């Protein structure tokens, strides 16, 4: 049966695949027929993701994308791919007056420098096939809105969205498309992992701010990645797609 969203015959590199959105992207890509190359910092959790993939021909390459030598190693070991899904990222809620160089380097380094440098090396080493697709998980923060304490996080994600537009323009000559998905709050462990725990009561309060009256789940984002990685989006490049349950409408 014809399916323009199929990833059959495509090889997709998925970063941040050991948990959260990245894990969901890897799983959904495998369900759509892709051979998936997964990478993440935590070897044990990366193995868990690998075990959940459907089909065969998948590869796992542990790497910390905040380390340039490890980015280089990942590119060396990675086969040629038809798509790249960038999901590695961290979040910390820190007011402006408490920002330090150390946590600025950590957040911007992981959320912006890592994906940008990985993309640069993949392009320079011709690891992305012509007519390929690059998708960045950015954020609603830094592009459409921002919340208290998110200035560093918003800056890192805003940088990523800006880079994606420039890359889309430059790589269009090779038929390579570059897009961003910009989710609002997605129910993952990203805040808990960083010690910024949002209580159930706070979550219920936040839900009331969304016209669709729920928070996002990982597949809300990973299905958008599948769309951008597939031929169904072959004439779309350089955009930021809000995935927010209608949040920016109010």
Please state what every model-predicted region is.
Residues 124, 169-170, 234:
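Alpha-helical segment proximal to the catalytic Tyr-Lys
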Residues 119, 156, 164:
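Active-site helix of classical SDR
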Residues 172, 177, 236-238:
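Short, small/polar-rich loop/turn modules that mediate ligand/substrate recognition or access, typified
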Residues 139:
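Residue(s) in the substrate-gating loop at a strand-loop-helix junction
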Residues 18-19:
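Conserved glycine-rich cofactor-binding loop
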Residues 95-96, 103-108, 202, 206:
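Substrate-binding pocket helix/loop in short-chain dehydrogenase/reductase
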Residues 214-243, 248-249:
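C-terminal substrate-recognition "lid" of short-chain dehydrogenase/reductases
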């Amino acid at each position: 049966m014809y399916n323009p969203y199929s990833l059959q015959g495509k090889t997709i590199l998925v970063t941040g695949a050991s948990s959260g959105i990245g894990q969901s992207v890897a799983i959904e890509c495998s369900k759509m027929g892709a051979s998936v190359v997964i990478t993440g910092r935590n070897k044990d959790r990366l193995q868990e993701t690998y075990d959940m993939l459907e089909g065969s021909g998948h590869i796992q390459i542990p790497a910390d994308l905040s380390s340039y030598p490890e980015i280089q190693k990942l590119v060396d070991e990675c086969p040629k791919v038809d798509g790249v899904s960038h999901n590695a990222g961290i979040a910390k809620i820190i007011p402006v007056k408490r920002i330090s160089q150390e946590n600025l380097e950590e957040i911007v380094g992981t959320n912006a420098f890592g994906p940008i440098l990985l993309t640069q090396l993949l392009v320079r080493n011709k690891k992305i096939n012509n007519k390929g697709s690059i998708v960045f998980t950015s954020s609603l923060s830094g592009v459409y809105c921002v919340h208290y304490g998110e200035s560093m996080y918003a800056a890192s994600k805003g940088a990523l969205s800006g880079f994606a537009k420039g890359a889309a323009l430059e790589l269009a000559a090779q038929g390579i498309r570059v897009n961003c998905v910009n989710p609002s709050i997605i129910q993952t462990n990203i805040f808990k992992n960083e010690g910024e725990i949002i209580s159930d009561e706070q979550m219920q309060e936040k839900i009331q701010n969304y016209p669709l009256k729920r928070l996002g789940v990982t597949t809300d984002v990973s299905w958008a990645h599948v769309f951008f990685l597939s031929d169904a989006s072959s004439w779309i490049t350089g955009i930021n797609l809000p995935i927010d349950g209608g949040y920016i409408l109010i």
